[in-house]
Curated annotation (Swiss-Prot):
Residues 1075-1091 have a biased composition (Polar residues). Residues 541-852 form the SEC63 domain. Residues 1075-1131 are annotated as: Disordered. Residues 1095-1122 have a biased composition (Basic and acidic residues). This is ATP-dependent DNA helicase MER3 homolog.
Amino acid sequence: MAAMGHLGDPYALRSVADLPPPFRSVFGFRYFNSLQSECFPACFLSDVNMVISAPTGSGKTVLFELCILRLLSRFLSSEWRFNLIKGTLKTIYIAPMKALVQEKLRDWNMKLGSLGISCLEMTGDNEFYNTKSIHDADLILTTPEKFDSVSRHGIRDGGLGFFSDIALVLIDEVHLLNDPRGAALEAIVSRIKMLSRLGTMKIAPLANVRFIAVSATIPNIEDIAEWLAVPSEGIKRFGEEMRPVKLTTKVFGYAPARNDFLFERRLQSFIFDILMQHSRGKSALVFCSTRKGAQEAAQCLSQTASSLGYSNPFMKSMQQYEHLKEAALTCSDKQLQACLVHGVGYHNGGLCLKDRSVVEGLFLKGDIQILCTTNTLAHGINLPAHTVVIKSTQFFNKEKGLYVEYERSMVLQMCGRAGRPPFDDTGTIIIMTRRETVHLYENLLNGCEMVESQLLPCAVEHLNAEIVQLTVSDITLAIEWLKCSYLYIRIKKNPQHYGIKKEIPRELLEKQMKDICVEKIHELGEYGLIWTDEDGFLLKPLEPGRLMTKFYLKFDTMKLIVKASACCTLEDLLHIICHSAEITWIQLRRNEKKLLNEINADKEGRLWFHVVGANGKRKKRIQTREEKIFILANDCLTGDPLVHDLSLNQEMNSICSNGCRVAKCMREYFIYKKNYKSAISSMLLAKCLHQKLWESSPFLLKQLPGIGIVTAKALKTAGIDSFESLATADARKIESVTGRNYPFGDSIKSYLPSLGPKIDINIEDAGNRQGKSTIIVTLTRLSQAVGSSKQNYADMVVGSEEDNAILFHEKIKTQEFSSPYSVKLYVPCPPNARATLKVDVIFEEYVGLDIHKKHVVSREDFHVTKVFGIKKAEPLYNLPAESCLVSSKTTRTNQSKYHNGQNPLSKEVCVIEDDFRAKAPDKDDNDLEILGTREYNNLASLEAPSFTLLHEEDYEDVPDVLASEPVEAECKSATNNTIFDHIRKKSRDFPNLMLSKSMDSSYEPLILKKMKTSGDQFGLDQSSLHAYEVTPMVFDRTEARVSPNNTDERCRNILTRTAETRSFQFTGKMDSISQKSEILNRTQGKNSTQLAGKKAFEKSKTPDENSLHFVGKRDSSSEKSKALSKTPDENSLQFLGKMDSSSEKSKFCFSSPLADFQPMQCTKQVAASVQPLTIQDYCKDILASAKSSGTGASFLDVKSVFSFL
């Protein structure tokens, strides 16, 4: 490569032959021009970042291509063979406009296609890409907003998966930073810079990403160079001397008219004089903002020229006239024909392809001297002219619904058409604008306009996006992200522009930047969009923040959504949209008030909602922009709006498009909050705004292609106003009533299958289950969409009307879900009351297909026999949605049995169970079971074991978290009159063991979750696995309450000694589950310690402050299990169940009155004051005490003591 880059004369033109052989075919010329030759070493022979400032038309695109080839040279072998590995080195090309992206796409597909380079367009016009196509692409061409939107999905959704392969970023028209849209460009470049610094990217191409930025002439190119870390050799600045054609620029200012529309029309009267003065008989392009404006300008010039007769300045010869006359006859557009014969034409998207080709050919040949066109031609086909006239610097923005200034890049692009290098050595640019904006365009054309950052006004939205993508996870990274922005560069150079004092010291300036960052984070945290720790250091995204990023909403709009009521109606949500920041540009004009007042009066009763005053009556006068938006939205949603004004129509369309996006965000937010009424309302409003129809509109058929308001009215007159009536109507009748020709009726009816199949809802009450009504909701597909490949989606929502809670929600594919599809819900019902269950199937796209059903759950004699769950319940009207358990299946039903217990509880206690997933043996893996309890037939088997020395007490204080597996111990005792008598005597120091009062009233379930640790330990978690019924054996440890002479009896009832194995068994009744577990439950003082699992101990607080619980699972075959056993040959201690893989002696927590005894390390639930202790240590203490008593304990060892214990 070095040989290829032989320098020679630094001022000589570089030859294409200096490139490797595989790359030479990319260029259709032999030599690079002077600008390209000067940049050749930096572009192709190095990997430095670059910023190039040069006039339009000087050949900057070739510099991009040289940098692309430099990257591709990594795939060249030593023999100059090109071996591309697709998608491994990506180039991102970012341009301000879609037209420019599409122009470069066509150009590079032709030039680089022979090398096998895969180019992908990523704009709003092209949605036909997916994750795979992005990963396989070598060159991605996109706009800033689209790339920001795609990458905002983040690591979570794979949106940033391709970032590691980015090796080259090409930024066209980087002066876009000065436009309001520049914030998106600044954000994505900062994002790339942040990700490139991650340690995980060290070996990825992104770690050494290269930035190449080009722009028109700007004065502060050094600031952009500092932002992109461009070294001095990478900064290239070129003046007007690099233009192949010298340009003369003129900016004319005119007095404003009554409105922007009339101002643009008035400029047409000045165009002819300007062309006569500056065009001098040469070709001219007149750029107009709209298609109609281009056509009217051409007609005005044509009429003026025709009035001059033979003195027509646009007609040079009779031969030219004959050519134009023949060409006009080939055009289908009559207005175009009339203009062409006078040497004037117009070009816009409204012409057919043939007419546009004719016009382009005539202009290139010189037969047409004047061509009026829209601004899209500035980025389309190359039609240069000597003179360029920009008629008005404003255009009508469809999204905003008003006239706005052209972006600077657009103006420069149009100016770039001036001057034709092969034919002219000069060119002229004329800009016609308002008087107050003349200086802006003079500075722009002269390269005197400073490029400032536009990030600060929307910094909170972009910072939230970074937090959602996990690129910013703490406050230091947030500050680092801000320092990666162009804002940080400019705020140091021009602090006054950003509201900071000019003479502020550098240290205070840094603090000011940090304060800005902290302020934005505080705002996000205040409204629940992100989570921060107590110190405000750690940052984590929350669902509302993710939704704001996903739907590209402004922060002010998201604040309105977060503050919305949980029971919003359609009217409430429509008011939120009217106040949203996305449409704040819509203003109320004086000449619109009369029409808006008439619409709000609504004498025909068309509107669903009206603007009302404080007295609740309709307002007679519309006074604010929000009221205007509300009226326009309601008028549009009738399906037959009264508004026909062009400007109001544009605003109406913008309200619907932006409002639909806001409503979709509200839909997902209210689903997340489980607010049933607001969620249903937002689902309906989103698709109504999309279709511009209320669900009860008589013009629902407008949703079908080919049916407009006129056809819909004709069908309604004939009684065909719904999809059902259209399906049954005769095709010939449809054609007759609409006045359309065959086969219109068949064509319309053929679209019906694309709406989706018919679905039926069935709600079945399957009885009561532990204080809950078992409801089975079944969806059945009644028809199949035949001949339609379109995929339709619907939301299935089950909600409770009384507590406004979503009990179940799922998005389904209407053509593909397994029919019948059943969902089982266990719905709590208050005593002597009714609970209303609502089931809705809301189709995502089409209005008028939704299904709604209601079911009333009623229980007259309501009581709960057992408490299942982890906490005391609330009545239904206060019950959270999580209390409703769901079992979702396709055709099977749950076979679990119900309790027949005899222990009733208070009526105000309802069943609450945690959701979890479990696979039953008789169910498919795909079936989802969300159950909260395990039931048993024989409640008598759960009775408490009898102990001679124990007495029952009422269990008054129910603990919040209990053990999960039932173990009752049958304890036997056997003693010898040996040294162990001393141990018995010592045991008198231990408190009595007593059964809790709760044993005769209720059984509390415990949740058990296996938590892997390095020591094969297990921890308790109340939100995991099954909630089992248990009968806890409560050993209440208090001061000794029995006399010494009954101690032996107590030991005989508790301890059983087996001589052969020297082991003692605690046995209990096992449950039907085959697993085995032991749980030791102890409470010392007010600190409770919980250890649970297959090997676990749990300590919990009881009314007597100190009690010991032994619980375990029951074996389904023998109803017995050994809770603790000793293996003589291994001399090791083990718990039945899962053994330690190393066969080491298990350490476990053992109850002791000694304050310095330490339990084993466990999960976070364990009290911090308790420390680990092994059973060996405990036995050693007993043995030492026994030997010191002088009772002949020399033959004992630790193992024998343990066998006794």
